[in-house]
């Protein structure tokens, strides 16, 4: 099907509505009455779904076959201009001048007995038809063109800024285009929310900004929806002026009425009642039909807590398609912003053509793939783009492409590659200390990563001071195959134990998550298989706070695993492992500070009150042959297919994981004999409209055969001790001890967290500017020795940082309470 679409697309060359033997260009400039350009004015051919938009200079172009046409020129604030055009056997030049709209106040049919502003009655009629227009078109297909440009309009005079200006190829005044992009795609839609886009061509120059959209689905904005939501722009949505509850958020004022092509168009000012969640600007309504004709709205950082931009102007133009059905021809984000003294502006423009309403799709057409990127999409040449783009480039944009294309061509030369490779791979001590060091080959197919130097030296009470060396080598064969090898060396100076292991992963089918795993060697694992604290943080808590939270054991192991997506949304994983496991004891008791109210605890987590040099038995030395498998079901799994592989998107529905683990007795001397099964239901993002979003995780399990198993085989929980917690992961506890409640009996745990996404703080002026997100949550656990454990917490977060206060209970008795913080590390 994809190949078929590519053939159709190439034959049509994007925006050709009636393929004929020869096409000619209708081109010109659109100006106002002062002969100033009208940027982004809409142009379309009457009785067709073929349209375009002028560029920033008011220049436009069409490709038309010989014949007679009626072209309509439109832009918000100007009278619609209708021009008859005849294309013969040559290109036609047509400059068009638009005159200002003169909206006049007059009687409005919708007014009736409403004594308030007539706009109120008009908007009631529009809102009453909101759902009808939202669901009017059951399906359609179209061709989409997306263009984005970001300009640096001024730069600071610092040395760093000058270096940045050179990097961005700005002029001597620190101005210029830092990023531009174009894309062409086919787009398909079916009610209620099925979409599929096929990327045919893509071109960009510069680094993609954080506020960036280059695919059609990013700009499929429908104001008939209750909320206007743009990923990355804000942690919450904004109320549409025609939302079901719009009168709670807006008042309206009729500015006047004009007649366009025999239809009355009302210009209505949108006035927010609150300083958040709402637009300002104007919306244009077609009387009698009571539908949106166009929108010209704005959001500001000061009132709406926007990310990345200071202002965002949203414009949309509707045109008739057929049978009185109107759909958007063009959509535009126009923005301004500043960061570190750099001031910038830009826009994203979307043009929709070749609408085919009520299209019938194959039953399996919407299979979960919402975007398919053709392998040739990034390889289209200048001739293709010169013919296919519906909006002409400005002189500055053409020059920017040429400059950056020449730089890209330079990068193919060996000398350039060698110099850039040397610069990129230069070892820098401070980044290596904290983030590690990554070096890549000239081709980018080979890479070597050295883990952070900060993790190289560690301390715990079992090994004393130790050395931990870890690296990862990766090689990519092609877009579908790669492998990685991670060797690790570890030595404790107190217990004199040397560990060495190798973890390998071979990806053979990236598109279907097909992988093999092979791991073997010796290590010092955490008794809690979910992990408790990193080597680094356990070192800090041990030496500074005299709290040795992590408990270790010795494992000499080997395992092999496999995973693959069986069908879309069903992932299967299986592995079998063999390990010789030995209990370990404390051998070192160093610390920087001493505390009268606490001391180091035993490495036996079930003997918390034993002395630090305790040698009580937690488990005998044993051998374990273990089989583990799970199947994860993601319903209506959506994904993006790129040449480099498959990208899975968060599910709109709960994800279900069924897990089974078997301790196999008697084979290779294995001592274990148990069967464990669990069921997990989770969802990371549950939208709650203007009130933010929720997440939850519920897990239940049991050992239905528990003849022989040891502490590390138990079911463990992601507990927390100390002052740090992880609010970004719903599934962890705030106050639960790491090991105390690990169980070989039935258990049930539940976690819930709600993020209000600023819905509360946005109403408090001083707090609003901080962009804080309000968090509330609860955790629950029921198992044999702890049948009714619960936690409740509330707090704030911003990006990866957070702080909250919580309290926990065992039954009706308060257990622990206090503050927890998180700053990106655990």
Q: Could you tell me what each predicted segment is?
A:
Residues 45-46, 70-83:
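A short, solvent-exposed loop/turn motif at the edges and junctions
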Residues 94-104, 109-113:
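Conserved "repeat-terminator" motif of extracellular CCP/Sushi domains
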Residues 22-38:
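Structural motif
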Residues 52-53, 79-94:
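Structured interaction patches on ligand/partner-binding surfaces of diverse proteins
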Residues 371-491, 495-826:
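Exposed, low-structure sequence patches enriched in small/polar residues
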Residues 48-59:
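Short, acidic Ser/Thr/Gly-rich low-complexity loop/linker segments typical of extracellular
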Residues 35-39, 61-68:
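Short Pro-Gly-centered beta-turn/loop motif in secreted/extracellular proteins
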Residues 113-265, 272-278, 340-342, 346-458, ...:
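Structured extracytoplasmic
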């Amino acid at each position: 099907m994809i190949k078929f679409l590519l053939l159709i697309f190439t034959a049509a060359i994007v925006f050709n509505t009636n393929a004929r033997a020869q096409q000619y260009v209708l081109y010109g400039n659109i100006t106002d009455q002062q002969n100033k350009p009208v940027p982004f004015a809409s142009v379309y051919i009457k009785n067709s779904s073929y349209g375009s938009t002028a560029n920033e200079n008011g220049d436009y172009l069409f490709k038309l076959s010989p014949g007679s046409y009626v072209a309509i020129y439109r832009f918000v604030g100007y009278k619609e201009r209708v021009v008859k055009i005849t294309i013969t056997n040559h290109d036609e030049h047509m400059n068009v001048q638009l005159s200002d709209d003169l909206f006049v106040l007059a009687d409005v049919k919708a007014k009736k007995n409403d004594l308030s502003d007539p706009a109120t009655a008009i908007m009631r009629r529009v809102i009453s038809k909101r759902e009808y227009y939202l669901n009017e078109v059951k399906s359609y297909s179209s061709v989409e063109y997306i263009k984005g440009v970001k300009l640096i309009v001024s730069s600071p005079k610092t040395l760093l800024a000058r270096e940045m200006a050179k990097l961005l190829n700005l002029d001597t005044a620190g101005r210029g285009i830092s990023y531009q992009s174009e894309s062409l795609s086919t787009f398909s839609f079916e009610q209620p929310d099925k979409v599929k886009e096929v990327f045919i061509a893509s071109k960009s120059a510069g680094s993609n900004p954080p506020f960036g959209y280059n695919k059609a689905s990013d700009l499929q904005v429908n104001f008939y929806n209750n909320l206007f939501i743009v990923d990355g722009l804000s942690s919450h949505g904004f109320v549409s002026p025609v939302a079901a509850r719009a009168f709670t958020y807006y008042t309206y004022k009729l500015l006047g009425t004009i007649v366009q092509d025999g239809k009355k168009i009302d210009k209505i000012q949108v006035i927010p009642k609150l300083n958040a969640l709402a637009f300002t600007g104007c919306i244009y309504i077609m009387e009698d039909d009571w539908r949106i004709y166009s929108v010209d709205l704005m959001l500001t950082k000061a009132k709406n807590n926007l990310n990345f931009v200071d202002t965002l102007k949203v414009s949309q133009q509707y045109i008739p398609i057929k049978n009185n059905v109107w759909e958007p021809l063009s959509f535009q984000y126009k923005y301004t912003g500043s960061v570190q003294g750099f001031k910038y502006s830009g826009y994203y423009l979307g043009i929709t053509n070749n609408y085919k309403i009520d299209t019938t799709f194959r039953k399996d057409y919407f299979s979960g793939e919402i975007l398919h990127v053709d392998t040739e999409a990034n390889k289209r040449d200048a001739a293709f783009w010169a013919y296919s783009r519906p909006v002409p480039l400005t002189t500055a944009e053409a020059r920017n492409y040429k400059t950056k294309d020449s730089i890209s061509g330079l990068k193919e030369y060996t000398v350039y590659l060698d110099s850039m490779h040397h610069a990129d791979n230069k070892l820098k001590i401070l980044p290596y200390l904290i983030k590690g060091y990554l070096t890549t080959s000239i081709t980018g197919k080979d890479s070597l990563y050295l883990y952070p130097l900060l993790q190289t030296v560690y301390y715990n009470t079992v090994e004393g001071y130790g050395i931990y060396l870890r690296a990862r080598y990766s090689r990519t064969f092609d877009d579908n195959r790669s492998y990685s090898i991670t060797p690790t060396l570890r030595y404790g100076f107190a217990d004199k134990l040397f560990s060495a292991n190798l973890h390998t992963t071979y990806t053979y089918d990236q598109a279907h998550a097909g992988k093999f795993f092979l791991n073997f060697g010796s290590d010092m694992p955490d008794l809690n298989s979910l992990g408790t604290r990193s080597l680094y943080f356990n070192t800090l808590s041990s030496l500074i706070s005299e709290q040795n939270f992590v408990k270790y054991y010795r494992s000499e192991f080997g395992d092999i695993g496999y995973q693959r997506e069986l069908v879309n949304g069903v992932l299967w994983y299986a592995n079998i492992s063999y390990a010789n496991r030995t209990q370990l004891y404390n051998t070192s008791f160093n610390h920087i500070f001493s505390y009268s109210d606490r001391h180091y605890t035993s490495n036996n987590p079930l003997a918390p009150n034993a002395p630090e040099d305790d040698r009580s038995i937690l488990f005998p030395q044993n051998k374990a042959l273990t089989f583990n498998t799970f199947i994860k079901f993601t319903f209506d799994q959506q994904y993006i297919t790129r040449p480099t592989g498959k990208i899975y998107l968060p599910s709109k529905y709960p994800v279900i994981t069924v897990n089974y683990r078997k301790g196999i007795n008697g084979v290779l001397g294995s001592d274990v004999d148990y069967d464990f099964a669990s069921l997990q239901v989770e969802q990371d993002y549950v939208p709650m409209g203007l009130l933010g979003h929720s997440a939850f995780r519920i897990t239940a399990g049991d050992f239905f055969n528990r003849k022989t198993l040891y502490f590390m085989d138990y079911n463990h929980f992601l507990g927390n001790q100390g002052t740090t917690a992880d609010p970004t992961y719903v599934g962890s506890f705030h106050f639960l001890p790491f090991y105390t409640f690990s169980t070989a009996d039935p258990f049930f745990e539940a976690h819930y967290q709600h993020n209000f996404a600023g819905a509360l703080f946005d109403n408090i002026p001083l707090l609003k500017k901080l962009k804080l997100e309000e968090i509330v949550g609860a955790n629950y656990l029921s198992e044999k020795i702890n049948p009714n454990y619960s936690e409740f917490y509330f707090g704030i977060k911003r990006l990866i940082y957070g702080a909250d206060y919580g309290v926990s209970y065992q039954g009706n008795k308060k257990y622990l309470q206090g503050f927890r913080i998180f700053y990106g590390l655990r």
